[in-house]
A protein has these predicted regions:
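Glycine-rich phosphate-binding P-loop
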Residues: 1-19
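Ordered hydrophobic segments in well-structured contexts
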Residues: 3-9, 40-42, 52-53
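Conserved substrate/cofactor phosphate-moiety recognition/catalytic segment
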Residues: 17-48
C-alpha cells in the first residue's frame, strides 16, 4: 500500500475520482475498505505515510475550503491548524498549492 497525506483542499478527492485511488477522508462519515495494493490519499496524517503535502499558507488554504468544510472543522476548534503544524514540524512535507498526478507518479517511482 502507498499512503499519501494531503492537506484538505489540495486536490485529493479529484485525483481519487479521476485515477481510482482510495479516498480516505476524515470529512466523510464512512471509510473505504483499504486493500494491500491500494494507493491511498488521506487527509489524516499518520506515521506511516509515504509522503506528506501541505499548502504554503494555512489561512489561505482554509479559506479556500467550502463553507460546509470550514464549518465542520471549526466545530473541532484548532484540529486542522494543529494538524497542519504537526505535519509541517514533524514530517518534512512537500510544500505546494495542489497535489498532481505527476507528484503521485514520482512517489511511486521512489517506492519502486
Amino acid at each position: 500500500m502507498i499512503k499519501i497525506y494531503t492537506f484538505c483542499g489540495m486536490g485529493k478527492t479529484t485525483l481519487c475520482n479521476k485515477y481510482g485511488y482510495v479516498d480516505n477522508d476524515m470529512y466523510y462519515p464512512t471509510r473505504p475498505i483499504i486493500k494491500t495494493n491500494d494507493i491511498v490519499l488521506t487527509n489524516e496524517p499518520t506515521e506511516n505515510c509515504d509522503a506528506y503535502f501541505l499548502p504554503p499558507n494555512y489561512e489561505k488554504a482554509f479559506n479556500k475550503l467550502s463553507k460546509d468544510k470550514q464549518k465542520f472543522f471549526n466545530e473541532y476548534k484548532d484540529l486542522l491548524k494543529n494538524q497542519y503544524n504537526l505535519v509541517k514540524e514533524k514530517y518534512n512535507p512537500i510544500i505546494k498549492e495542489y497535489i498532481t498526478q505527476k507528484d503521485i507518479q514520482e512517489i511511486l517511482k521512489k517506492k519502486g
